[in-house]
Amino acid sequence: MIGGGILLMVAALCLTGFNVWDGWRAGRESQKVLEQMAGNTVENRTDLSGVSELSGEEKRLPVIPVDGNDYIGVLEIPDQNLALPVMEDWSYPKLRIAPCRYKGSAEEKDLIIAGHNYDRHFGGLKQLSPGDPVEFTDVEGICYRYEVAEVLTMEGTAVEEMETGDWD
């Protein structure tokens, strides 16, 4: 019985250690991408805005390609000293690197960014307060400024509420 308890404690410590390491890794990856994005010039950017309206696909945005992933801009939360690259489209493996555009665009005022709760990513969002500034700068250098109106915790399955909420 004691051996089983010790085994469970060791497993819990290993899991905690992995989670801490994974958060550190994600923060390092995001910073590496930011550095590479900063070195890109307008000539190195890819304009993917020519997707046919008839195709039913969402309009693609100008991007900066870095290590096989396309990035649409940088999200900054000054009060948390946080700057993160934002990938053009999302998947679970991509969320392990950086926040991702879930849907929409800043220009159309319907941008939804999905992110992981790593300490070096979105882990501190729950500490934001109404009035805190948030900025998104796209790869063309256009800065969209926002202000936190409310901090709301939603279930991970609340996709419809997230997509249809009146957030602006």
Segments and roles (model prediction):
Residues 2-168:
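Solvent-exposed, non-transmembrane regions of membrane-associated and secreted proteins
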